[in-house]
Amino acid sequence: MSIDALKERIPDFAKDVRLNLSSMASDETLAPQTKYGLFVAAAVATRNPDVIAAMQAVARDNVAPAVIAAAKSAAAIMAMNNVYYRFVHLASNKDYATMPARLRMNVIANPGVDKADFELWSLAVSAINGCGMCIDSHEKVLLAAGVSTAAIQTAVRFAAIIQSVAVSIEAGAADLAMAAE
């Protein structure tokens, strides 16, 4: 599935989402590897098969398979870390923050791609998953690596757009299912 095919699936009630998707696809603020890896990581975080297929298709046309694999790794490891660290952050009992996580996360240290790209993808997925502690941690690493606040904001904006595409398509599918009854 292509991004154009995905746009066609976005219902009219979400016209702004469709326009944002078009703008995102043509945006050249981020380097290609950064951008297309972000598309894949954020798509995987939405858990929507159509969004994942479209973003992987556009990524395959623009980056190496290793980039796509690393982006999927970012989404997978953040699925775990975002749950765990959101709990640690939100729990009233602060003893959890002093306990070892005992979670394997070697991919963060050795992602197989540029470390800043992996951190940016991880931050975007953390924004989708709502882990403030993870967002702060990844932002700190990115800023120390010299990544601009504008690039960080762009990554989160793209993640927000990709999430809204998934929600819009799912809401439109629910409308179609109700109409068929």
From Swiss-Prot:
GO terms for biological process: cell redox homeostasis; response to oxidative stress. Keywords: Antioxidant, Disulfide bond, Oxidoreductase, Peroxidase, Redox-active center. Its EC number is 1.11.1.28. Antioxidant protein with alkyl hydroperoxidase activity. Required for the reduction of the AhpC active site cysteine residues and for the regeneration of the AhpC enzyme activity. It comes from Rhodopseudomonas palustris (strain BisB18). The active site is at residues 131, 134. Gene3D superfamilies: AhpD-like. Pfam families: CMD. This is Alkyl hydroperoxide reductase AhpD. InterPro entries: AhpD, AhpD-like, AhpD_core, CMD-like. It comes from the Bacteria.
